[in-house]
């Protein structure tokens, strides 16, 4: 994976040819509609973590798609939901801000389910933006065959009422995404390269490492633990033989620490093994991963601790 160094890579940004299109595209929607899966498929490699747990995405992550004719910068935003703590409020605020700071918005829905209250809440937000909106009917592969026509029609009626074009695809299988990507490109104005052509994300390597560790916690632990977890990469050591990564897992309660560690350390070992394998894929080399767990009560309610964990917190 090509990881950015902003000051070092500015000189490598070429001049765009005539007719080149570029712009920023926010992917928004309620939790668990497949925003991160869509980002990974369009970019062509895994830069955003995925899991069945709602609010998996916490930071606004950019994925960069560069072709000979365009550069599309995708913003994978946290799922828009009713927040219950300071972290949740920060996540939703960041997602809403993205709607008003991009050239195009993709409103992503789970077309295998009926239109819900969460989707309608996003629709209400999108009505307040002046920019163009397209709708992605994701999870076409998961629609019950006998309900496909009815489900698609309900979403198409909604989008037609607002003048938003509608596209059907499966982010999981990739079916329909080629046409969708072409549609995004066609809706962008002529513009420059914003990033070097070989870059796929704006996030540093340590951020991706931390997210890969958090992903395994989301996948392997109980429902009550994932939302209370934060990861900090304390140190990365490069040696000729391998990369040594030291990471702290922060939870809010001692009981959650016990769940993360598991009986005789079994859960922590499972998390570490799975995360190490993913990090090795990321950096294409051998990795030693050392994890330790600590308790910080109510860290999600603390603006200072949210800042320390790298979340965008604005007044």
Curated annotation (Swiss-Prot):
PROSITE patterns: G_ERA, KH_TYPE_2. Residues 29-36 are annotated as: G1. Residues 169-171 are annotated as: G5. GTP binds at residues 29-36, 76-80, 138-141. Keywords: Cell inner membrane, Cell membrane, Cytoplasm, GTP-binding, Membrane, Nucleotide-binding, Ribosome biogenesis, RNA-binding, rRNA-binding. GO terms for cellular component: cytosol; plasma membrane. Residues 55-59 are annotated as: G2. InterPro entries: G_ERA_dom, GTP-bd, GTPase_Era-like, KH_dom-like_a/b, KH_dom_type_2, KH_sf_prok-type, P-loop_NTPase, Small_GTP-bd. Residues 138-141 are annotated as: G4. Residues 76-79 are annotated as: G3. It comes from the Bacteria. Pfam families: KH_2 (PF07650), MMR_HSR1 (PF01926). GO terms for molecular function: GTP binding; GTPase activity; ribosomal small subunit binding; rRNA binding; small ribosomal subunit rRNA binding. Residues 221-297 form the KH type-2 domain. GO terms for biological process: ribosomal small subunit assembly. Residues 21-190 form the Era-type G domain. Its main location: cytoplasm. An essential GTPase that binds both GDP and GTP, with rapid nucleotide exchange. Plays a role in 16S rRNA processing and 30S ribosomal subunit biogenesis and possibly also in cell cycle regulation and energy metabolism. Belongs to the TRAFAC class TrmE-Era-EngA-EngB-Septin-like GTPase superfamily. Era GTPase family. Monomer. This is GTPase Era.
């Amino acid at each position: 994976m090509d990881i950015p160094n902003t000051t070092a890579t500015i000189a490598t940004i070429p001049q765009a040819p005539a007719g080149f299109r570029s712009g920023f595209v926010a992917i928004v929607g309620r939790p668990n509609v497949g925003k991160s899966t869509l980002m990974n498929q369009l970019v062509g490699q895994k830069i955003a973590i995925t899991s069945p747990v709602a609010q998996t995405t916490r930071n606004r992550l950019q994925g960069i798609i560069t072709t000979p004719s365009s550069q599309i910068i995708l913003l994978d935003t946290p799922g828009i939901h009713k927040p219950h703590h300071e972290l949740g409020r920060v996540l939703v605020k960041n997602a809403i801000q993205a709607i008003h700071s991009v050239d195009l918005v993709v409103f992503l829905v789970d077309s295998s389910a009926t239109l819900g209250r969460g989707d309608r809440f996003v629709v209400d937000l999108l009505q307040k933006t002046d920019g163009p909106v397209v709708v992605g009917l994701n999870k076409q592969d998961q629609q019950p065959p006998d309900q496909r026509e009815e489900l698609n029609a309900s979403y198409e009626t909604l989008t037609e009422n607002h003048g938003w074009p509608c596209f059907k695809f499966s982010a999981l299988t990739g079916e329909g995404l080629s046409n969708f990507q072409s549609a995004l490109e066609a809706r962008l104005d002529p513009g420059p390269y914003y990033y070097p052509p070989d870059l796929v994300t704006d996030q540093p390597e340590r951020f991706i490492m931390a997210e890969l560790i958090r992903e395994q916690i989301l996948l392997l632990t109980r429902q009550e633990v994932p939302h209370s977890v934060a990861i900090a990469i304390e140190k990365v050591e490069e040696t000729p033989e391998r990369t040594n990564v030291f990471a702290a897992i922060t939870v809010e309660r001692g009981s959650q620490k016990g769940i993360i560690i598991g009986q005789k350390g079994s859960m922590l070992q499972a998390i570490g093994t799975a995360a190490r394998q993913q990090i090795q894929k990321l950096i294409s080399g051998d990795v030693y991963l050392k994890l330790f767990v600590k308790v910080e009560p109510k860290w999600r309610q603390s603006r200072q601790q949210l800042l320390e964990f790298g979340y965008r917190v604005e007044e």
